Every structure is written in structure tokens, then in C-alpha cells.
């Protein structure tokens, strides 16, 4: 099957950290006392995939975007970074999410200051995206959309937006807006360079899609937002929404059934 929308990220994101989430924190630092290959194997090993490169688990946030697109009737799937090249001929867009694109968030930035070295997550992402760009040089119509918790970081590196051919940066909860962007891509319409999802435009509880396939290590969310409303925090500025027990049960049953 051909997919119009390939959702992906680098190896530090598409991994289950040997079924130990806390090993994932090693990707926020540079390799210390060990060769980088061993450090990466410990913190971000390759994950099992099917014959077309779909990982058996994927980050929960990417699963939500995948589910939103699938529920809306779009041809979308998450693909392991090592298999993206197999889908470039049919894809209309590559959609990328990340927790810390350029090691500007904690604890990556602290490790960077302490060691004066680039953390593994930022290094892996740079190599990952450079590899993609080199493979799509002749595919001028292929769009690249970036988002996720670290989308704000692109605002601090505007030169890289042009270097890496980024068409749209989506900052905020993306389930609603990603469907609009996907339709624009299929229609051949112009895309906005940057979208800031206002808290008032965040999806309501009944607009949040339930994941279709397992998340990394079975992690799910049971609520969004925060009642505090702190101005300095992107989470607390969003409306609070508690998942119903039925929603939680459905996602847990899916993960158990497909494990």
C-alpha cells in the first residue's frame, strides 16, 4: 500500500529503549565514557518493524497524529527512519515530531553546557534530516512538516528551516490542524510557514483520536492541560481535559491485544 503521509522521527525517538523508558534519558547527553555506538545501542536500539518498515511501537504523540489522519480518511502511517527511502516515491509529505530537535530543552541543554559537546538526540536528528534531504533533492513537491513538543525550537534556528526545506512548523496540539494541512497538500494549495495553535483551538475531548497501534512501552495519556495557567508553561496554558475511563480502557486494550 502506498501512503501519502509518512510520519517519522530519528532513532532516538523511534525506539523502546530496551523496554526501559529511563534509558531514553541517555539520548539527551553526549556519549560519556563509552564509544558513541555503544551509547546509542544502550539508549536507542533499533525497534522491530514489519516488512514495509512500520515499527511495532512508536511515540504516543506520533500515534495520535497518525490516528487523527487515519480517522479522517487520509493514507498515513508511521515509518521507521531506516525505511523512509522505500516510501519517498509515493509520499506527498513527511511529518516529523520530536521532543528536543536541537538540544535546547532540559536536560539536553545542561549536558551541552557541561560537556561542550552535542547531545546524541540533536546529533541523530541532524544526521537523520540531512539524509532525507539528500534523498529528496529532485522531489520538489514533497513537503516536510514538523511539530511536536519541541516545535518552538525551530523559531530559534530560522536558517535551518530553509536549509532543511521545512514547509510548515506546527506549534501546539496538532490533531485538528494536521488534517487541514494534509488536505491542503493533497489539493496542491500553498502552506503556511508557521502555525501557532492557540489554546482555545486545542481539540476538545471528543476530537482527540484514540491510537490505532501500540505506543512506546505502552505509555498513554489520561489527561491534557493543567488548571494552574502559568504563563511561562506551554502545558498549563492549555485547557484541562480528562480522558474518560472508556477512552483509557480502549487504548490499553489495544496495546495489550497488539503487544
Model-derived features with residue positions:
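A short, charged/proline- and glycine-enriched loop
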Residues: 1-5, 89-90, 213-216
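Short, charged N-terminal beta->alpha structural module
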Residues: 44-72
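Cofactor-binding loop segments of dinucleotide-utilizing enzymes, especially the Rossmann-like FAD-
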Residues: 9-10, 149
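Conserved Radical SAM active-site core
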Residues: 1, 13, 38-39, 46-51, ...
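Glycine-rich beta-alpha loop elements in corrinoid/cobalamin-binding modules
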Residues: 61, 77-207
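Radical SAM [4Fe-4S] cluster-binding motif and immediate context
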Residues: 205-259
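A solvent-exposed, charged loop/short amphipathic helix patch at secondary-structure junctions
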Residues: 21-52, 101-127
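Short N-terminal binding/cap micro-motifs at the start of the first secondary-structure element
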Residues: 13-20
